[in-house]
Amino acid sequence: MKIENGEKLLFIGDSVTDDNRARPVGEGNNAALGNGFVRLIDAYLAAEYPERNIHVVNMGVSGNTSRDLVERWESDVTAQNPDWVVLCIGFNDVWRQFDTPCIPQRAVPLDEYRKNLNSLADATRAKTIWMTPYYLEPNETDA
């Protein structure tokens, strides 16, 4: 595994990352990390690599777009001095075109999304894992 002993792994993104994390910083164990994939990854790392003492932090904010991340990157990422950053963003960049079509300035067009991701990459000193929006196909057996 590439994550070394005692390293800090910071997750940042939108509601997919946030998932009801503690404020102002989601860290520690269990509920403080939220109820989603960050908590699951922390539990996995603790179970499989307990000797590594990996410090997991959740800085996700529901409703955020890549534009919001650019604005809060310094305070929520750089100031935390992580060794690794896991970024999951883009759902709301697209969704704002549909949930508030009468307010087009809330949407983040693809060219701005790319520009924002490049800006975040340039501002990041830590090793980075990028997650972009993914498509979930509905389960045909769901009611």
Residues covered by each model-derived region:
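Alpha-helical cap/lid subdomain in secreted, periplasmic
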Residues: 2-5, 40-55, 64-143
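Short glycine-rich His-centered loop
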Residues: 2-32
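A structural signal for the hydrophobic beta-strands that form the central parallel beta-sheet
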Residues: 11-12, 58, 130
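Short catalytic helix/loop segments, enriched in acidic residues and glycine
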Residues: 26-48
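Glycine-/proline-rich flexible loop or hinge segments
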Residues: 25-26, 55-57
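Contiguous hydrophobic segments
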Residues: 15, 26, 37, 142-143
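Conserved active-site regions of diverse hydrolases
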Residues: 61
